[in-house]
Amino acid sequence: MEIRQHEWLSASPHEGFEQMRLKSRPKEPSPSLTRVGANFYSSVKQQDYSASVWLRRKDKLEHSQQKCIVIFALVCCFAVLVALIFSAVDIMGEDEDGLSEKNCQNKCRIALVENIPEGLNYSEDAPFHLPLFQGWMNLLNMAKKSVDIVSSHWDLNHTHPSACQGQRLFEKLLQLTSQNIEIKLVSDVTADSKVLEALKLKGAEVTYMNMTAYNKGRLQSSFWIVDKQHVYIGSAGLDWRSLGQMKELGVIFYNCSCLVLDLQRIFALYSSLKFKSRVPQTWSKRLYGVYDNEKKLQLQLNETKSQAFVSNSPKLFCPKNRSFDIDAIYSVIDDAKQYVYIAVTDYLPISSTSTKRTYWPDLDGKIREALVLRSVKVRLLISFWKETDPLTFNFISSLKAICTEIANCSLKVKFFDLERENACATKGQKNQTFPKLNRNKYMVTDGAAYIGNFDWVGNDFTQNAGTGLVINQADVRDNRSIIKQLKDVFERDWYSPYAKSLQPTKQPNCSNLSKLKTPSNQPATHNATGREPLSA
């Protein structure tokens, strides 16, 4: 600092101010120091740039993540909204075709249908109903859009002389497949049916249910749905014998889409099990019942005020709001005030496994309760055939013993024996016929009817798949009442020469059948002779 001051003081007086200012400036740094400084500055600047780029990328990433979160939340909300919408549709009872409780048809026509085997005849004044074959053909002739059929048997195309009606039915189904009519068929996986294979090749949709895997049982359901309007429910499957030597009974509903709305869900339940070896833990809401024994369908049947619902078995196949078959039968017996008439092929209150047989009290106990506690008259009409279990007679004797010392206890049992007629036939007649069997499965009371697919055997209800129908009517005196018609059918059979009060003998008495008419295709008629009073 002193040197610079000396230089400034010793400067010539002729030097300008600018020259003195330049002399006073510090010396320039060396080139090497300049390069180091430049590199350092460039490095700092590059780091600043990298930091700014990273910050911008981070902002973009955070922004993208926020957008993804928002989009995911919107998708979730949309999914929940769709689920709620479909849930609301299910609650309203609407199916995929737009059919709901609000727009379905509940003013219906109903008809009993029967198959009466050739050679089984009644008196001329007996009631008769629409032949089963004619009823089925009517349904197929009415079909314009769809035919849904559940059946345990599919044996229509047989060469036996009495199988002609089955062959005609098979030909009609084949014809429908070429008319742009949707055909959906359900059968048990054990069914080895050429009929099903032929229909499948023509475009029919076939579903096989593996009941053995589900519940160690088999499919016994038998019902039709045509055009989402018409329904058949009854004992007969698609077997040529059901149109020949088997005595069958069922009902057909016409223009009854409200009943279809509920029954279609059982069909959909069966279809949902296609390719599955186990039953789902929870059923879709679209398979929930629409009506049950607490919320019955209100409808008109032949202009008669009625209530109805369908039930299902086994309990494993009963989603929410679907009545179990046993509960449906209970509701009919509990509502009876005067009488309960039951017609089944087999009555055996036993549950059987491969190792043991145990008493199954569900229905047997309910009958005893009605007899003893409510003094309701009970009539049991049971088929007698080669497969009748000897224990049946023990249980019947046990039931009869209840009424021996109890006032107002009325129980009567008869066995409907059609094999006796075959035993009395000539050798030539036997070669032309198969053993006949009464396969009716129904119950009728003074206010209700139950038509099902099961005999009253424990394993049927606990293991097998079957469907039942309950109809309630207040006025059962009108001839249009399906309850009255079914009661008349029961009494026709009860008072016929085929029904015997005592245990049938395996040695047939052919003299009682000598006056029977020769086999004919005429409808059944009624035998009014030899009636016992109902109050007995």
Task: Identify the role of each PLM range.
Residues 2-536:
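Charged, low-complexity intrinsically disordered terminal segments
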